[in-house]
């Protein structure tokens, strides 16, 4: 009957004291062979063999206890010969033989060799007469001993598959049970030592120094974001978490992880159901813009993060509904997604670029036409004004100079209509020819004398005076030059 095989021991080699590689490889091969034989012994051992060796004498137990003390040392060269190794270097690096292996697997491997020495079938019964008297109990059971106090090995020690199962005595059963407990304690100690110490554990250790705090939940102290871990992070932590739970049940007979395990299982189921869930209005259609999709993604991440956030082993209030079903959670997440959903906006139709350019070009053309018309009309007005105002042949007037000259001409006409300027006209008619510009000053001074009397006589005789334009232009030129001369003297 095949029994359940225990966890194979893990052997760690301490190679810090070994400077040469061949010795290390040779020692490693020996350890591997010992482990393989130990595994076969575990597989072939059964619980029905426990009742077959109860009739042995009490001095055999004392003899086996004496052999257990001798088995703590390294195997002898004769035992290496049983494995087929004929040459063994006796190199001494000042290291005890029991320190070759750095972990508890060394004792396990050596105790296995002790079990094989004591579990031999009746194949060497002929050599029982050569054994010392102290080993008669073992000789009666079919074992042979050499000169070093060790039993000589035969092919029956390693043929674990034929001839039934190995004969194991009750003392061997106790030794195997002790080895299993040592291995479990060693593995539990390694796992606990490498667990990180958190602030909560330190605080609980200070408040309760007699109670040793352990990390009951790998997710209660470490909150990883959704972007860094994959979707199946519950399956990632599950094997390690189950292993720790089994070991703690064997040592403490407690079940502290059932609540957190149920929460992780519910979280995984909710994540898978939410990933497969699609809202009523699909975001893949053209009815929504890119900003709407971003808002829905943000709402989905918030819903998932609220589920994955565990505060001291208690789920967030968003996940604690009345019935605790996934449907209520999905309804809440859908409502949160609708809250972030923006209403549709209908924008006015914008004209194309070609229409905008055509309209702009038409406006520019019309503005240019109006500007040209305004400039042309202004130029025509200045030309007509220059024709009306008496000018000299040497005048090259700008628009501003033309306007100033026009104001002076208007002032001259106002003075001509007064009483004093009428006498000037009479003096000009008396002279007959307007050839001398130098006598203009004398004429103006003479006109000042008796202007009023002359004006009255002229009005009575002829009525309103009629002055031809040529005479006005001549008089304006004389008056203009006289004004410029006075301005320069001043």
Curated annotation (Swiss-Prot):
Subcellular localization: Nucleus
Reported consequences of knocking out the gene: Embryos fail to form the ventral furrow at gastrulation and lack mesoderm and all internal organs.
Low complexity bias: start-end ranges: 102-134, 244-263
Database matches in SUPFAM superfamilies: HLH, helix-loop-helix DNA-binding domain (SSF47459)
Keywords: Developmental protein, Differentiation, DNA-binding, Nucleus, Phosphoprotein, Transcription, Transcription regulation
UniProt GO MF annotations: DNA binding; DNA-binding transcription factor activity, RNA polymerase II-specific; protein heterodimerization activity; protein homodimerization activity; RNA polymerase II transcription regulatory region sequence-specific DNA binding
Phosphoserine, modified sites: 325, 328
Domain annotation bHLH: ranges: 362-413
Disulphide bridges: none
Biological function: Involved in the establishment and dorsoventral patterning of germ layers in the embryo.
Protein name (database record): Protein twist
Species the sequence originates in: Drosophila melanogaster
């Amino acid at each position: 009957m095949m029994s359940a095989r225990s966890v194979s021991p893990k052997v760690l080699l301490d190679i810090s004291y070994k400077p040469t590689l061949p010795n290390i490889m040779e020692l490693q091969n020996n350890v591997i062979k010992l482990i393989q034989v130990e595994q076969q012994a575990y597989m072939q051992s059964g619980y029905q063999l426990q009742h077959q060796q109860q009739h042995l004498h009490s001095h055999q137990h004392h003899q086996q206890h004496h052999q257990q003390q001798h088995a703590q040392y390294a195997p002898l060269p004769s035992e290496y010969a049983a494995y087929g190794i004929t040459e063994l270097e006796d190199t001494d690096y000042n290291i005890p033989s029991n320190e070759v292996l750095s972990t508890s697997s060394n004792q396990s491997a050596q105790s296995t060799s002790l079990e094989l020495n004591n579990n031999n079938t009746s194949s060497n019964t002929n050599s029982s007469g050569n054994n010392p008297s102290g080993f008669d109990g073992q000789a009666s059971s079919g074992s042979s001993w050499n000169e070093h106090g060790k039993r000589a090995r035969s092919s029956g020690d390693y043929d674990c598959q034929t001839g039934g199962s190995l004969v194991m005595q009750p003392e061997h059963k106790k030794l195997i049970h002790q080895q299993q407990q040592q291995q479990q304690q060693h593995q539990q100690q390694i796992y606990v030592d490498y667990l990180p110490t958190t602030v909560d554990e330190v605080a609980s250790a200070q408040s309760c120094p007699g109670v040793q705090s352990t990390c009951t939940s790998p997710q209660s102290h470490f909150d990883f974001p959704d972007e860094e871990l994959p979707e199946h992070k519950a399956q990632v932590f599950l094997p390690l978490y189950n292993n720790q739970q089994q070991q703690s049940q064997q040592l403490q007979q407690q079940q502290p992880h059932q609540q957190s395990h149920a929460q992780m299982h519910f979280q995984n189921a909710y994540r898978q159901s939410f990933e497969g869930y699609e809202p009523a209005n699909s975001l893949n259609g053209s009815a929504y813009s890119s900003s709407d999709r971003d808002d829905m993604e943000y709402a989905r991440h918030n819903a998932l993060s609220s589920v994955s956030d565990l505060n001291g082993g208690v789920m967030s209030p968003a996940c604690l509904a009345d019935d605790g079903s996934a449907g209520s959670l999905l309804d809440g997440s859908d409502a949160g997604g609708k809250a972030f959903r923006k209403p549709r906006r209908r924008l006015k139709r914008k004209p194309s670029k070609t229409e905008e350019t055509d309209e702009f070009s038409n406006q520019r053309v019309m503005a240019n036409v109006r500007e040209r018309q305004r400039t042309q009309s202004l130029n025509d007005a200045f030309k007509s004004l220059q024709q009306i105002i008496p000018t000299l042949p040497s005048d090259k007037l700008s628009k501003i100079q033309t306007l100033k000259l026009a104001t002076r001409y208007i002032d001259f006409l106002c003075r001509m209509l007064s009483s004093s300027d009428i006498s000037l006209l009479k003096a000009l008619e008396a002279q007959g020819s307007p050839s001398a510009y130098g006598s203009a000053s004398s004429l103006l001074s003479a006109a000042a004398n008796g202007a009023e009397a002359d004006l009255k006589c002229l009005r009575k005789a002829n009525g309103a005076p009629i002055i031809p334009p040529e005479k006005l232009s001549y008089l304006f030129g004389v008056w203009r030059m006289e004004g410029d001369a006075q301005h320069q003297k001043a």
